[in-house]
Amino acid sequence: MNNILVINGPNLNLLGKREPDIYGNITLENINQKIKLHFKNEDLRIDFFQSNEEGKIIDRIIESEKKYNAIVINPAAYSHYSIAILDAMRSINIPVVEVHLSNIYKREEYRKKSVTAEASLGVISGFGYYGYIMAIEFILNNLSIGK
């Protein structure tokens, strides 16, 4: 069985309330349910983690290598400046795919750069919750995980 960890960063617990014109009305819990439902027939365990605290995200990334085959991460605002999260991502030997709900390249100038992308296999941006599904599909179909 493959084990994938989905990490969500700061303020994503506010989805459904925060800036619905950008993020829509879907909640993080709804996103997690849609992901689980999409992969219900796969031999796959998906765990979800969300924190507004950088240190907790770093700890979870570092610990993930013991339990998971891959990570899907939405670092949210931390993607634009957290060298600490970048370093944690670089320190592990499992694949990481970065996801953003909105198209960061259509946003404010300071949101157009993702420092964490440097440690990601790829970045999926602008497809809403479906970006998480795309990331997991990529991991399952293109990487030799759990073998």
From Swiss-Prot:
The record marks R18 as: Transition state stabilizer. Belongs to the type-II 3-dehydroquinase family. SUPFAM superfamilies: Type II 3-dehydroquinate dehydratase. InterPro entries: DHquinase_II, DHquinase_II_CS, DHquinase_II_sf. This is 3-dehydroquinate dehydratase. Pathway: Metabolic intermediate biosynthesis; chorismate biosynthesis; chorismate from D-erythrose 4-phosphate and phosphoenolpyruvate: step 3/7. It is an enzyme of class 4 (lyase). PANTHER family: CATABOLIC 3-DEHYDROQUINASE. Keywords: Amino-acid biosynthesis, Aromatic amino acid biosynthesis, Lyase. The keyword Amino-acid biosynthesis applies. The keyword Cell cycle does not apply. It holds the Pfam family DHquinase_II. It catalyses: 3-dehydroquinate = 3-dehydroshikimate + H2O. One of its GO terms (molecular function) is 3-dehydroquinate dehydratase activity. The gene is aroQ. The active site is at Y23, H100. Substrate binds at N74, H80, D87, L101, S102, R111.
